[in-house]
Amino acid sequence: MKIPEAVNHINVQNNIDLVDGKINPNKDTKALQKNISCVTNSSSSGISEKHLDHCADTVKSFLRKSIAAQSYSKMFSQGTSFKSLNLSIEAPSGARSSFRSLEHLDKVSRHYLSEIIQKTHPLSSDERHLLSIIINSDFNFRHQSNANLSNNTLNIKSFDKIKSENIQTYKNTFSEDIEEIANHDFVFFGVEISNHQETLPLNKTHHTVDFGANAYIIDHDSPYGYMTLTDHFDNAIPPVFYHEHQSFFLDNFKEVVDEVSRYVHGNQGKTDVPIFNTKDMRLGIGLHLIDFIRKSKDQRFREFCYNKNIDPVSLDRIINFVFQLEYHIPRMLSTDNFKKIKLRDISLEDAIKASNYEEINNKVTDKKMAHQALAYSLGNKKADIALYLLSKFNFTKQDVAEMEKMKNNRYCNLYDVEYLLSKDGANYKVLEYFINNGLVDVNKKFQKVNSGDTMLDNAMKSKDSKMIDFLLKNGAILGKRFEI
């Protein structure tokens, strides 16, 4: 096992220049032209299949790099956190992003690596041994979801990609993430130390959150990925009692269980979240772990970490206790090299929120379950599933009345169906189906929330012009709140 020269003989600049260097805008284009020129008039050139495969791979690599540049350009130019930390770049002037954003990622990674190298130099022999283990470890990357993302090929899309394709699904990306770090064009993964065993995954939650019943695991990284030591937006490590493997630490250690809850950040305060590219990530993880171990007053924990024979599972327990590693791949992952592991059953509501048609069909086998499913669809504003259920089952006005009487569905307990059909964010196509098929009365007044209002009141409040126009054409009137 070998430690990089950067750690053996540390000689790092005190300040990493974060100003983007200039690149030749034609460099990659010329290289691409040179590599794909072989396919010109291929019918007469007698070119080999191996050569054609090489040309195709070159084009794929170029496109993958171009997509990554777009994702990083968006993140570094739009994220307000990067602007406040003087780590931002200018937005591209044209429609296309240059590879300058990828160069910027490398510079930002070197900046954070420089910070932690200076903080931890020099290393003891125990520290060097632990660092060598981490650097030479294989990683698994885990994406959890209630959606069915694979058949023979695993396809995971970023929130931005999903939105651009008008796909309706439950999201874990919030407005604060988009505004402050703008990393909504990346796919997210938890990170584990590989133990090369069949027992996967080692962890089932990330940052205390169970993101889904299906774990999709890959063992290969991306040349354009980046890693953060925590959730990129929420960089606070939770108290030990929220950790998935809390008993392991509570049973074996004392002081460290009170030390772990903290913000993980760089030199510019708690919003300064260290970022490492794929090449630097193992070194960054190792040095930050060593920095934490040095500060710990728990001698037993320190001895456990520096055990020369530490096994991969124990190392993973430590790293995902001290940190909550998060890996990000630009835009989309598509691979046939993966494992899918079902961790638990998926509830009907979770399957609906994830647009998991396979699970929905397995669970909704009769009209009674269809009532539940339709209520969940309306409550979660899942128009795609609502319309699917309406097309599959012959719903009547009596079905809607029975649905409203269900005691074990919170949406029907709290709201009238008419309210759910017309609330802010509801899809007017679903409302249109209900009215056109006589399932609800256009002017029925709400009996539960906003008692006395009608669907037109809701549409007026949300300023949904399509819904307003449709309701008015069908004779809708306002409820008593707006009567003069």
From Swiss-Prot:
Location of the protein in the cell: Secreted; Host cytoplasm
Site (described: Important for catalytic activity): H143, F188, F211, D231
Entry EC number(s): 4.3.99.-
Keyword set, alphabetical order: ANK repeat, Host cytoplasm, Lyase, NAD, Plasmid, Repeat, Secreted, Toxin, Virulence
Family of the protein in this entry: Belongs to the OspC family.
Name assigned to this protein: Arginine ADP-riboxanase OspC3
Effect of F186A: Abolished arginine ADP-riboxanation of host CASP4/CASP11
Self-association and partners: Interacts with host calmodulin (CALM1, CALM2 and/or CALM3); specifically interacts with the apo form of calmodulin, preventing calcium-binding.
GO molecular function terms attached to this record: ADP-riboxanase activity; calmodulin binding; toxin activity
Function: ADP-riboxanase effector that inhibits host cell pyroptosis. Acts by mediating arginine ADP-riboxanation of host CASP4/CASP11, blocking CASP4/CASP11 autoprocessing. This prevents CASP4 activation and ability to recognize and cleave GSDMD, thereby inhibiting LPS-induced pyroptosis. ADP-riboxanation takes place in two steps: OspC3 first catalyzes ADP-ribosylation of target Arg, and then initiates a deamination to remove one N-omega group.
Consequence of changing F211A: Abolished arginine ADP-riboxanase activity
Effect ascribed to mutating F188A: Abolished arginine ADP-riboxanase activity
Enzymatic class: lyase
Disrupted-gene phenotype: Host cells display increased pyroptosis.
